[in-house]
C-alpha cells in the first residue's frame, strides 16, 4: 500500500484525496509547522490539521502524523483521531552519528552535539528510552506506530528492537547504498538488519 508524505496545505490535501493512497503521512513543510526537533507542531497547527485529517478520512485515507516522541504530542495526535503516528528519530540519529562516526571532525558537525563520548552515550540512551516510552504510550492509545528520519544501516537495529514500532520509514540510506550494491541487495541488507527473530 502507498503511504504518501505531504504537507497540510489545502491544495496538496485536495490532490492527495484525488490520488487516494492507502495512507497519508502529514509532515512539516514550512518553518512555522516544525517543532525544534523536527516533527509537526501539533499545538500550533491543530485546527489546520483537523481540517486536513477530516478531509482525508472522508476520502477513506488513513492518516499518520510525523511527530516528536513526546507523550503530550502523542495525546494530541490521538485526539485528532489519526490511525498512525511516525516518531521522528532525527535526534537519535544525530546523536548516534556524533558518537559512532567521524562526523564531529567534518564541516558537517552538529555544534550542539560536540560533547564528550560519555555525554553522547548518555544522550543516546535517553533518546532511545524516549522513543521506547513514547511507543508504549502510543500503543496504549491504540495508535499504530512507525518511526523514521536519519535511520540507516548503522543505527537501525536499536530502533527496530522496539516491539511497538511496526513500520520503519527509511529512504535515503537504502537508495544511497543501492548505487553501489543495486536496489535489491540494498533492500535485502536492510531487511536482514531489522528482522527480529
Residue spans of the language-model regions?
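Hydrophobic faces of well-ordered beta-strands that scaffold small-molecule active sites
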Residues: 2-6, 24-26, 63-65, 85-87, ...
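Histidine/lysine/aspartate-rich catalytic loop segments that bind and position anionic ligands
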Residues: 31, 62-64, 68-128, 134
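Glycine/small-residue-rich loop that forms an oxyanion/phosphate-binding "nest" at active or ligand-binding sites
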Residues: 1-46
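C-terminal helical cap(s) of enzyme catalytic domains, especially alpha/beta-barrels
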Residues: 38, 97-114, 176-197
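C-terminal alpha-helical cap/extension of soluble enzyme domains
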Residues: 139, 145-196
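Catalytic cores of alpha/beta
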Residues: 9-18, 70-81, 147, 151-165
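Glycine-rich phosphate-binding active-site loops on the catalytic face of alpha/beta enzymes
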Residues: 26-33, 84-97, 164-183
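Alpha-helix-loop-beta-strand connector modules within alpha/beta enzyme cores
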Residues: 1-6, 42-64, 109-146, 190-197
